């Protein structure tokens, strides 16, 4: 079924849109952007900051908007005050190619935060991250039902970062 908003549009209509996650901070958006850029080994930059308007309810001594890039993905950090907090309902997944990259990124992001189940962590700002080896998705698509069950069991029993060799061994049986 075609959604009503798409009725009458050609099926091959190309949309030149970009998804830009907006992250709501109390007042640490600029600090968080710099922290994330450092965690990604400098693979990012602060694009722009926008000062708070005098009539805005946002904090006046920090930028209200901090636009930044991480690994080619654009984000917006908003210093909007304490009314909203991050939760696990939304997480950022970073797919890494090997254990060294996983270990380095994990250590940088979990610093001041906490380890969570299933390869997740919560950073010091409360934002949830999944640091996932690309091998995980390869194992899921290449394995049979028994291999996938073993892999999922290994994932569900993990608290903290993934050990790629352990996931591979679980999938192999």
What are these regions (language model features)?
Residues 30-32, 77, 86:
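Intrinsically disordered, low-complexity acidic/polar segments
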Residues 21-24, 91-97:
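Short, well-ordered beta-strand elements within core beta-sheets of diverse protein domains
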Residues 63, 87-89:
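Short, solvent-exposed loop/turn segments at the edges of secondary structure
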Residues 11-13, 22-72:
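Core segments of cupin and vicinal oxygen chelate
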Residues 2-16, 45-48, 69, 76-79, ...:
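Vicinal oxygen chelate
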